[in-house]
Amino acid sequence: MQHVFIIGSRGLPAKYGGFETFVEELVTHKQSADVYYHVACLSDKEHHTHFQYAGADCFTIKAPKLGPARVIAYDMMAINYSLQMVKKEQIAHPIFYVL
């Protein structure tokens, strides 16, 4: 199983366009059962909760409201949490796709 972590979009389902639509199209048109997507989702309320969307593991990150710097904090927090998941679940050779 190839685990792919997608970081940098606001999450799923797509509500904004651009990166979000790309991620939704990628996840919903997956061609191989051997690929498993983990998608970071920006949240104002929840932190480190998981839900399934179109077969992908979506996890929430509640980044602090820092104005334009919020997206940088969000990316860093999502990468850190993803690395924790990789270590905890002993995922070999994960792929990180940072948008």
Model-predicted regions and their roles:
Residues 24, 28, 32, 80, ...:
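Short, well-ordered alpha-helices that flank and scaffold nucleotide-derived cofactor binding pockets
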Residues 1-4:
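Extreme N-terminal starter segment of soluble prokaryotic enzymes
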Residues 7-15, 29-69:
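N-terminal strand-loop element at the rim of the active site
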